[in-house]
């Protein structure tokens, strides 16, 4: 059964200075967690906050630094939204984000083009990692004990990476952006970090053709990631009935698109499609999604005044 009841009190202050070139925001926040799931001696957490940016004379180059921390109250809902296959037997803890910082540069060359490049570093205690549960020989037909669900393991995790973003804005309705993030993870004791991809790519595009046709498209790529694999063995060989090893789960590449034709103020003709183009169709090992989904139809918007 779930064991969780928690809240927190929060106090925050900040100093803001906005100049023509230099923008400076400094502050801090204090958090006091409470609840029957808290330790016997709960602590008071203080996190600093800093946002600094500086515009060059032309305004086309803006170096920036963002730094903060936080105390994230996890829940079964938040875990299940990220991983719908978590078992309903989680010991839920809050995540202490001790450091979260980005240092980089924004560039605006002109003609609607903008670039962003930054280095990222974060360090968290009680960072949630999803680990595949083994097959339980004494499961008594309990659904989530058939090696088909995930538990949450908490540990200290460092995250380091490089993020690049390019955006081209042609007009108010026409733009395209591409963001790429490459990350390295470090866990206490040099243990494996499960189900976290080192490479993520996101593509988004919006276009309006004339005054009646709207087109949207997006693409998402997540790279390979490590996952726990449980191999059933005889109870004589292993008392748990499982042998645990690490496997690599293949990358996933998906695209989504939609086209809307506005016939008039109330009637729309539309098409929506989702396609997964990789051999692996799910972020989670041994779960697969439909590789293609297509929907088309006509939409009527009611004008109801109460």
Where are the regions a protein language model picked out?
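Outer-membrane beta-barrel transmembrane domain signature of Gram-negative proteins
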Residues: 1-20
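Exposed, low-structure sequence patches enriched in small/polar residues
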Residues: 21-23, 27-306
């Amino acid at each position: 059964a779930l064991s969780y009841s928690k809240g927190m009190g929060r106090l925050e202050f900040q100093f803001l200075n906005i100049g023509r070139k230099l923008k400076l925001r400094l502050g801090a926040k204090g958090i006091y967690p409470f609840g029957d799931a808290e330790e016997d001696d709960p602590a008071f957490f203080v996190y600093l906050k800093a946002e600094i940016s500086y515009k060059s004379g032309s305004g086309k180059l803006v170096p920036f630094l963002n730094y903060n921390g936080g105390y994230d109250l996890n829940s079964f809902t938040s875990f299940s939204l990220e991983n719908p296959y978590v078992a309903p037997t989680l010991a839920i803890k809050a995540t202490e984000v001790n450091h979260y910082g980005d240092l980089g540069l924004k560039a605006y060359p002109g003609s609607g083009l903008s670039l962003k490049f930054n280095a990222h570093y974060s360090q968290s205690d009680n960072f949630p990692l999803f680990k595949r549960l083994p097959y339980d020989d004494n499961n008594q037909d309990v659904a989530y004990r058939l090696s088909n669900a995930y538990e949450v393991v908490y540990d200290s995790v460092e995250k380091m990476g490089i993020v690049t973003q390019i955006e081209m804005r042609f007009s108010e309705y026409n733009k395209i952006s591409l963001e790429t993030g490459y990350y390295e993870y470090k866990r206490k004791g040099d243990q494996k970090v499960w189900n976290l991809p080192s490479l993520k790519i996101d593509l988004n595009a919006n276009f309006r053709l004339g005054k009646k046709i709207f087109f949207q498209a997006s693409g998402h790529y997540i790279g390979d990631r490590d996952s726990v694999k449980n191999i059933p063995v005889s109870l004589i060989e292993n008392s748990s009935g499982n042998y645990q090893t690490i496997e690599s789960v293949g990358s996933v590449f998906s695209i989504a698109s939609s086209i809307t034709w506005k016939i008039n103020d109330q009637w729309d003709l539309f098409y929506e499609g989702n396609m997964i183009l990789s051999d692996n169709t799910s972020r989670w090992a041994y779960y697969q999604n439909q590789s293609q989904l297509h929907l088309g139809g006509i939409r009527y918007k009611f004008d109801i005044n109460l």
